[in-house]
A protein has these predicted regions:
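Iron-sulfur cluster-binding electron-transfer modules in prokaryotic oxidoreductases
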Residues: 1-176
């Protein structure tokens, strides 16, 4: 409907923009993020829009990460459970979809489960937290968006005095 209102915009996913900025050298991952990572393909990004490469390329550029693919990935990916408003429903029988997906991720013993969708992030985090509470998942496992991984890697490491090596930006003036 935007063209009908005079807008002609190319819409891209944030992972496509971030991959472009990394490829152009405008964002340079330098700080290692150590560990095994597994990436969950969001339904709309992957199977609906056929975008599989940018998130994996970003992960591949972050030093220290070793990517392990889940059994069901890319075109054969499995939903996180948020689709169709199931995010707000309680299962009456069987296993919650997000728990099924997290069990698949945990079988790889990852340090990080990553995705590129805020709904997937909520569903995967909910399940991982439940697994931690039950003692099934290690306490150190994290669920993060690919953008957060990149941010953690482009930040300059702390110097021994505990300050970043880059100058800090001045605080903005409050709006009056």
């Amino acid at each position: 409907e935007y063209p009908q209102l005079g807008g002609d915009y190319e819409v891209i996913h944030h992972t496509q923009l971030l991959q472009h900025l990394v490829d152009e050298g405008k964002l340079v991952p330098v700080t290692p993020v150590e560990g095994i990572i597994t990436y969950h393909d969001p339904c709309y990004l992957g199977r609906h829009n056929k975008i599989y490469t940018p998130p994996r390329e970003i992960i591949g550029k972050v030093p220290g990460l070793r990517n392990e693919e889940m059994h069901r990935h890319k075109e054969r990916g499995f939903c996180c459970g948020a689709g169709g408003a199931r995010m707000w429903m309680e299962e009456r029988i069987g296993k919650r979809i997000n728990n099924e997906r997290v069990d698949e991720a945990l079988s790889l013993n990852p340090d990080i489960v990553s995705t590129a969708c805020p709904f997937c992030l909520v569903m995967l985090t909910d399940s991982v937290n439940g697994k931690k509470n039950d003692g099934v998942a290690k306490e150190s496992i994290q669920v993060v968006d690919v953008a957060q991984l990149l941010l953690d890697s482009v930040r300059t490491p702390l110097d021994p005095a505990g300050e970043t090596e880059t100058e800090t930006a001045p605080e903005p003036e409050p709006v009056k």
